[in-house]
Regions:
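Bacterial Sec-dependent N-terminal signal peptides
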Residues: 1-27, 45, 52, 179, ...
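Conserved beta-propeller blade signature
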Residues: 52-54, 97-99, 137-139, 177-179, ...
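Residue-level detector of Asp-centered blade-edge/turn motifs that repeat once per structural unit
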Residues: 47-50, 92-95, 132-135, 172-175, ...
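Trp- and S/T/G-rich repeat-edge/linker motifs of beta-rich repeat architectures
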Residues: 26-33, 68-74, 114-122, 154-162, ...
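Loop/turn residues immediately N-terminal
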Residues: 59-61, 104-107, 143-147, 183-187, ...
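Residue-level "micro-hotspots" composed of small/polar
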Residues: 19-53, 74-87, 123-125, 163-164, ...
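Short loop/turn segments that connect beta-strands within beta-propeller blades
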Residues: 65-68, 110-114, 150-154, 191-195, ...
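Coil residues (strongly favoring Ser/Thr
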Residues: 129, 154, 195, 225, ...
């Protein structure tokens, strides 16, 4: 029996999230031919009624479902196919159905058959622009003429310009008014009934000898403004109510010549301008203009300077098409401050984050597995990197396994290299400590975690058990009160008990009574091969454990345990760290996203790249909560920090589409399924 693989493509299912985070940190996700895009020259982009993102290129039409690209190209052996692979423009009618402009005419997409119907009168014509009005009439700019096409009866009407002129652009406003731009610098209001025009000179009070060809009109979706780009020059804002205009002088402000290719009004006070020299963000109220540019050293910067088009999706995400560098996505959900390595002078070094802590000065210390320690300086907001230094005063090794700050001291744990102690003021390592179980041991225990307790005691979890700092003799001593097993975490509960996470079990020690007790796998109702990675206590005194078999809640009163796994909402069974907030919610890092779990209701919300994460893959022992309530989580590509109160998720109904059928890992041919493999189901994001 053949193995059938059904791929459920979840179309841009994002939790709606309100955020108050700083919006100045622009991060972009990149899609290029390596990710499945047919060609890196992306010309246009649109989202259809089902949520698919369609991208036009010079080598076919791409449909993106959030995971994979499906490419539609010209097929000479098929009658209902695109006539040209060069896509010039895309749009949807009032029903949300897709229409495609190409160098060989206009096509209507049939999503059931996944075929394209050619509009006959556009044969062999390049389609410059098209747009639907509120009556679902299609307006097309073709050969310098404006054409109105009735999609119901296929009748069309041509609106031709006066002699020696040509229409260069047009737009339809939210009031359903048709405005046309021409090569002589006029913007004209068309009355379709009697074909009359009201024309206005948008150069009446501008500098003389300015090129007058209007290249683009973009109607504001929120106000009565029309944004105007004119050839090889600048931007104007036209007010249809007053029939007057304003010059923005973008080029003068930035002292460079730009080619304007696209507009997008992010909100009523912010205009995005796509040019051949990067992204310009213009604040309507203040006139402030910010330029966002490509940085080849930054993996999350713009892919290129040359922007060709914008598209806003239904979640207010912004897709950016580039002339030669594919597609970028900008997420509107910005609850997380993101830090990642790149080659800048004051950037973070190393990708794999192993531990995080803050000091009394507000600096953030980040230990990596591949580049020593980074300090995010509070005063300058820049990173300083610390690695081994020949001759002393440096780290023992670049592979950091534990960090903890205590006053002016920073405790640094290594793999088989013991503990370094750094003076935070001087930034020098002032002493090194060995971790030896007894006088016969010659090899240091490998550090897994470091914990400074409420009373200031320093505990170190290692592969061989627990070590405790001896203040009197300035050394670390092996603590026989704890089992001699590898310790993944150390946690102090409200009663002062010290919890450790181990293989197959958790153990807690009571320093007051000098007694301890195991909480083995059978009491936790879990598998024998489980690992406890972290532990924490909720307000009711229940213990929560992050394990490789999910998250476990243990009730001391009843002795019962409750499991959270992929079967009941977790994105992964591998949970690394748990941080509780002030609202009875646990924040959990996993191998497949960041989770918030409401302890009262059990509701799980997962955060991924769609919410601004740089990766879903978090890391062991890499989380911290500072005194101001800021949470830090480390991943294999950097770290994030945020305040839970600024992340407010809301449930959203979402569609799931069966987008393709695979047989033995290969897509099904048309002879297997005669119509599109799409089917729909409604889910509640809870």
């Amino acid at each position: 029996m053949k193995h059938l693989k059904l791929i459920l493509s979840i179309l841009f299912i994002f939790c709606l999230t309100r955020t108050y985070a700083d919006d100045s940190n622009y991060l972009f996700r990149h899609y290029q031919v390596e990710n499945g895009l047919s060609d890196n020259m992306a010309t246009c982009c649109v989202q259809d009624r089902k949520g698919y993102i369609w991208i036009g290129t010079r080598d076919g039409l791409n449909r993106f479902d959030g995971y994979t690209f499906k490419v539609f190209r010209n097929d000479p052996d098929e009658t209902e196919t695109l006539g040209s692979n060069w896509i010039t423009c895309l749009g949807c009618d009032m029903n949300g159905d897709l229409w495609v402009g190409t160098l060989s005419g206009l096509y209507q997409y049939d999503d059931e058959k996944e075929s394209f119907r050619h509009i006959p009168f556009t044969a062999d014509k390049g389609i410059d622009i098209f747009q639907f009005d509120k009556d679902n009439k299609l307006w097309i700019l073709m050969d310098g003429n404006l054409i109105r096409f009735n999609t119901e009866d296929s009748q069309f009407r041509i609106f031709a310009p006066e002699d020696n002129q040509s229409y260069t652009t047009f737009c339809i406003t939210r009031e359903n008014s048709i405005w046309i731009g021409s090569s002589d610098g006029l913007i004209s209001l068309l009355n379709p009934e009697d074909e009359t025009m009201e024309s206005y000179n948008v150069f009446a009070h501008s500098s003389p000898n300015t090129p007058r060809k209007l290249s683009m009109l973009y109607p504001s979706p929120t106000t009565d403004r029309i944004y105007i780009a004119f050839e090889h020059d600048d931007v104007k804002i036209f007010d249809p109510a007053t029939r007057d205009y304003q010059d923005l002088n973008i080029q003068k402000i930035n002292q460079l010549t730009i080619l304007i290719n696209s507009f997008l009004e992010k909100d009523k006070d912010e205009l995005w301008i796509g040019t051949d020299s990067g992204l310009f963000i213009y604040k309507i109220n203040t006139g402030e203009c910010t330029r966002i540019r490509q940085d080849p050293l930054d993996p999350y910067a713009l892919s290129s300077h040359f922007i060709s088009a914008f598209c806003r999706d239904r979640e207010n995400g912004i897709w950016i098409c580039f002339h030669q560098n594919g597609l970028n996505y900008y997420s509107p959900f910005r609850p997380f401050h993101v830090h990642y390595p790149w080659d800048g002078q004051y950037s973070m070094k190393g990708e794999v984050i192993r531990d995080i802590c803050t000091d009394i000065y507000g600096n953030i210390w980040v230990g990596t597995e591949d580049a020593g320690i980074n300090c995010l300086e509070k005063k300058t907001e820049t990173f300083t990197n610390y690695q081994p230094v020949p001759g002393g005063n440096g780290l023992s090794h670049t592979n950091i396994r534990g960090l903890a700050a205590s006053g002016d001291r920073l405790w640094i744990g290594h793999v088989i290299h013991g503990i370094d102690l750094m003076d935070i003021k001087t930034r020098k390592v002032i002493k090194h400590y060995n971790l030896l179980k007894d006088s016969l041991t010659v090899k240091n225990s490998t550090v897994r975690c470091i914990k400074v307790l409420q009373e200031g005691q320093v505990y170190v979890g290692t592969d061989d058990g627990i070590y405790k700092y001896d203040f009197l003799n300035d050394r670390f001593l092996y603590a026989p009160q704890f089992p001699p097993f590898a310790v993944n975490c150390i946690y102090e509960d409200r009663l002062g008990r010290i919890w450790t996470g181990m293989f197959n079990r958790s153990f807690y020690y009571n320093p007051i009574s000098n007694t301890g007790m195991y909480l083995p796998y059978d009491k936790l109702n879990t598998q024998r091969h489980n690992f406890v990675n972290d532990a924490c206590e909720d307000k009711d005194g229940n213990m929560w454990f992050a394990t490789v078999e999910g998250v476990i809640k243990y009730d001391f009163q009843t002795g019962e345990s409750l499991h959270y796994t992929v079967k009941n909402g977790m994105p992964s069974n591998v949970a690394f760290r748990i941080l509780p907030d002030e609202n009875e919610t646990l924040w959990i890092s996993t191998a497949n996203g960041l989770v918030s779990l409401e302890t009262g209701t059990g509701k799980i919300t997962t955060y991924t790249e769609s919410h601004g994460l740089i990766t879903r893959q978090f890391n062991d022992n890499s989380a911290f909560k500072d005194n101001e309530g800021t949470f830090y989580f480390g991943s294999v590509k950097g770290f994030i920090h945020f305040k839970p109160s600024e992340v407010i998720p809301a449930a959203e109904k979402m569609n799931v589409h069966l987008g393709s059928l695979e047989i033995q890992n290969e897509a099904g041919e048309k002879r297997i399924i005669n119509s599109s493999a799409e089917s729909e189901a409604n889910l509640n994001n809870s």
